[in-house]
Design a protein with these regions (language model features):
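Zymogen propeptides
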Residues: 1-160, 167, 175-177
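A substrate-binding/cap region within the structured catalytic cores of diverse enzymes
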Residues: 155-195
Length: 195
């Protein structure tokens, strides 16, 4: 059984967010004591805005933490390498992951924010691309294969050595697998996107 919010301890917090470096988190809490005003279960730090520089909290691998929300079980981390930079979203409840389609699929597209809002999403990202003939596409024609709540859309990308497309599948038991685009979609797949 789940603990009541008032019973959540620091150890409970770090059991879920094991990626967070405890010393840097404690330093942040020392500087921002209001963070614990509602206990460990009430932690909701968000310094991920475009005009914000993130927190002083680090992961155990040294990445900067941008946001952590205990209730939603989400962690945002700034990641960077020689040829990339971005934000890694760590969602601790895989049952909440889903692929959602534009309401105008086949006619027009929507922004990722509009799709997320329509489906009660907390975090969102684009999945499949869309066909854009002559740069005149409107986002309504799906590129590649996708599945949303067990309903398949589009056609699979052709897998070649030069273009090794893959498919991200979320299964009905809420596990995730990545498969080649030329492999059959698993029978227990509920959501998928190809890239």
């Amino acid at each position: 059984p789940e603990k009541a919010a008032s019973q959540i301890t620091a150890d409970d917090f770090y059991e879920i967010f094991w990626e967070i470096d405890r010393d840097s988190m404690q330093s942040y809490l020392d500087e921002h004591p209001q963070t614990l005003a509602n206990g460990w279960a009430g932690i909701n730090i968000n310094e991920s805005g475009l005009n914000q520089s993130g927190t002083s909290i680090r992961t155990t691998m040294g990445e900067q933490v941008l946001a952590v929300n205990f209730r939603e079980k989400v962690l945002l981390v700034r990641v960077a390498g020689e040829k990339y930079r971005g934000v890694l979203a760590v969602a601790k409840v895989p049952a909440r992951l889903s692929v959602e389609m534009s309401e105008g699929l086949g006619s027009y597209g929507q922004t990722v924010g509009e799709i997320a809002e329509a489906h009660g999403g907390l975090l969102s990202m684009t999945c499949n691309g869309f066909l854009d003939p002559g740069g005149q596409g409107n986002g309504g024609d799906l590129a590649g294969f996708a599945m949303s709540d067990g309903v398949a859309y589009g056609a699979h990308y052709t897998y070649t050595d030069d273009f090794p497309y893959a498919r991200f599948e979320i299964l009905t038991d809420n596990t995730v697998c990545i498969r080649r685009s030329d492999e059959e979609v698993r029978a227990d797949c509920r959501d998928a996107t190809e890239f």
